[in-house]
Every structure is written in structure tokens, then in C-alpha cells.
Swiss-Prot record:
GO terms for biological process: tRNA wobble position uridine thiolation. Belongs to the MnmA/TRMU family. One of its GO terms (cellular component) is cytoplasm. It catalyses: S-sulfanyl-L-cysteinyl-[protein] + uridine(34) in tRNA + AH2 + ATP = 2-thiouridine(34) in tRNA + L-cysteinyl-[protein] + A + AMP + diphosphate + H(+). NCBIfam families: PRK00143.1, trmU. It comes from the Bacteria. Pfam families: tRNA_Me_trans, tRNA_Me_trans_C, tRNA_Me_trans_M. Its EC number is 2.8.1.13. The active site is at C102 (nucleophile), C199 (cysteine persulfide intermediate). This is tRNA-specific 2-thiouridylase MnmA. Disulfide bonds join C102-C199.
Length: 361
């Protein structure tokens, strides 16, 4: 694809993926402007914050490949649109996915608006996904060809207007080849590790971070039979399916099998735990999702056979759309799903096409 004469703003994070994205687009003839987003203000000098080094990496890459870069601060927008929701959800006992909201509200809204103000026709990011326009003129979001790195799950809330102005150059390229390109062109960050976890938490212990904003509220830890086997520190600090950090590893209670978080009783501040990975309380045949968002603007029809993911990196699970009633979606799975977690996203697929989804209730 030739980009001759077209201006594109590339979200550059200092990582390998966005750096190769910028280089690829320049090779295609685009006028590339790099934009570094600062979405978090606190702890810039802490051992966990890499913002300063990331910016230096962006500048080094930009100098090498010959593109202009600028930094823009979206910290206020991030706290209002993403982090506030993150805290509300955890306070309510759910486990949110802030990366999904960050994409919809910051990277493909605030960032997109800023890029348009710079005279860009399109934006680009280093996400592993694909966009195509179908015969009806609709834009479709597809999985990356490298399914092991596919990130369409995190992008399922994007709409037609956003996708129509977005390029995902890495969607057609295996991750291994991206690393090879970085080395071949001599990128200074070619061997930099991929970022993991929630962006504003970084490598710091999650429980320590959350405790800065939410108070502990100890309560009983019970089995399904009602037997008290321990004490939790606060329901917000646990997620369904959690095994590590429960505090029952050396317990004499039970049959020796591993313990898992199974349910939260918010009204009575009680955490229910079970033993065994396949305990019935951890298996869900039917789920309901709300706060729905559909890439094409329309939901799938009731009765449609689809596939769904209820967490990132999960294999597609066969399901049937039982009902779409306003802002509520009901899915029935061919096989019960493990540790379906309220607050996470249920994302629907028709083959490689990501249709959209909603928040699990």
C-alpha cells in the first residue's frame, strides 16, 4: 500500500512494535509523525515508572528512522475516563480491564482527535490486529494473522469512525518478523522486552498499588458449605479463579487440592473459596453482559452461533447468542467456561472477525 503524500500520526510508546510500525509506514511513503502519550502523572521518579526512559527510546528511534516526534499529556483524560472507572469497578467487587477502556477513550479518541488537529488523515498503532472494508462499505476489525499475538480483544469497543481512520501495519506480520526487522534496521530498542500488565501499575505489586486507593476491609473466607477457613483482606483485592495470594496454601483445611476464589458476597463481605480447578462453582454455562459495543453498530441476531472470549489469550469458545435485549446480551456456551469474571469483557467473533462485546455481569 502506498502512503505517498498522506500524513499519519503513529502512537509511539518506546517499544519495538510501535517503532517498527513507524518505520514500515515511512517505507510506504507516508509522512510520519510520532506521538508519545503520557497517560499517568504519579511516580515518575519511582523504581516502577519507565516513562522517562520510554520517551528517550522514542526520541532515539525517531532520530534513526527520520521522523518528527512530540509528547502529549493525556493524564487528566485518563484519570477521568479510565482510572475512575477502574476504581469504581474494583470497589464494587468486579475485575475491570482498563486496557479496553483506554483504547476506546484515549488511544482511539483523545489521541485520534489530537492527530486530526495535526492534519493527519489516519493514525496507526503497534497493535496486532487488522482492519478491512467489506463489500458493503463497513469497516471490520479482524484478528491479527499471528493469532498468538492477536489484540483484537482489547480493541472490540472501536467503532466505524475510529476504524476508518486507523492503520494496524503489524496485523499482517508475525511477531518474530517484527523483532527481525528491528534488528535489521538497527533500532536502539530492538531487544527491549514487551510491556506487560496494566500500564499505570507497571511492575509494582498489584495489591500494593490498589491499597493506595482502596481501603482493606477484612471478612470471612468460606467454603460453599459455609465453613470459615480463613480471613480475606477485602473483596476488592481478589478475582474469580485466583489461586495465588489467598493465604490458604499451608492450610490444614480441606482435601489437599489447591484453593481458588469462586464467588464474592458483597452484601455480607464474604469471600467464597473452593478446592479443585474444575469445581462446579468455577464453571459458567451462561453469562450476561451489558454496556454493549458493536463494531458495525448492530448486534448479532438472537440464535446466532458465534465464538467468544471471556478473557485475553483464551481460546475461542463456541457459543450461541440467546438474547440481545437493549443493553443486555445473553450467551450460552457449548461447554461451561472457567472462572467467568464480572467486570471483564465478553468479546464475540465470527471466524476472524471481531464483532464487539460487553462487560460481564
Amino acid at each position: 500500500m502506498s502512503g505517498a503524500g498522506k500524513r499519519v500520526v503513529v502512537g509511539m510508546s518506546g517499544g519495538v512494535d510501535s517503532s517498527v510500525t513507524a518505520w514500515l509506514l515511512k517505507q510506504q511513503g507516508y509522512e510520519v509523525i510520532g506521538l508519545f502519550m503520557k497517560n499517568w502523572e504519579d511516580d515518575d521518579d519511582s523504581e516502577y515508572c519507565s516513562t522517562r526512559q520510554d520517551w528517550l527510546d522514542v526520541v532515539s528511534v525517531a532520530d534513526l528512522i527520520g521522523v518528527d516526534v512530540e509528547a502529549v499529556n493525556f493524564a487528566a483524560e485518563y484519570k477521568d475516563r479510565v482510572f475512575a472507572d477502574f476504581l469504581r469497578e474494583y470497589s464494587a467487587g468486579r475485575t475491570p480491564n482498563p486496557d479496553v477502556l483506554c483504547n476506546a477513550e484515549i488511544k482511539f479518541k483523545a489521541f485520534l482527535d489530537h492527530a486530526m488537529s495535526l492534519g493527519a488523515e489516519t493514525i496507526a498503532t503497534g497493535h496486532y490486529a487488522r482492519v478491512r472494508q467489506n463489500a458493503a462499505g463497513r469497516f471490520e476489525l479482524l484478528k491479527a494473522l499471528d493469532h498468538t499475538k492477536d489484540q483484537s480483544y482489547f480493541l472490540h469497543r472501536l467503532n466505524q469512525a475510529q476504524l476508518s481512520r486507523t492503520l494496524f501495519p503489524l496485523g499482517e506480520i508475525p511477531k518474530t518478523r517484527v523483532r527481525e526487522i528491528a534488528a535489521e534496521i538497527g533500532l536502539p530498542n530492538a531487544k527491549k522486552k514487551d510491556s506487560t500488565g496494566i500500564c499505570f501499575i507497571g511492575e509494582r505489586p498489584f495489591r500494593d498499588f490498589l491499597n493506595r486507593y482502596l481501603p482493606t476491609k477484612p471478612g470471612p473466607m468460606k467454603t460453599p458449605e459455609g465453613k470459615v477457613v480463613g480471613e480475606h483482606i477485602g473483596l476488592a483485592f481478589y478475582t474469580l479463579g485466583q489461586r495465588k495470594g489467598i493465604g490458604l496454601g499451608g492450610s490444614r483445611e480441606g482435601n489437599g487440592d489447591a484453593w481458588y476464589v469462586a464467588r464474592k458476597d458483597m452484601a455480607n463481605n464474604t469471600l467464597y473459596v473452593v478446592q479443585g480447578h474444575d469445581h462446579p462453582w468455577l464453571l459458567t454455562p451462561v453469562l450476561t453482559a451489558s454496556d454493549l459495543s458493536w463494531v458495525a453498530g448492530e448486534p448479532p441476531a438472537a440464535g446466532a452461533a458465534m465464538a467468544a472470549k471471556t478473557r485475553y489469550r483464551q481460546s475461542d469458545a463456541a457459543c450461541t447468542v440467546q438474547a440481545v435485549d437493549g443493553d443486555a446480551l445473553t450467551l450460552r456456551f457449548a461447554e461451561a467456561q472457567w472462572a467467568v469474571t464480572p467486570g471483564q469483557s465478553a468479546v464475540l467473533y465470527d471466524g476472524d472477525i471481531c464483532l464487539g462485546g460487553g462487560i460481564i455481569q
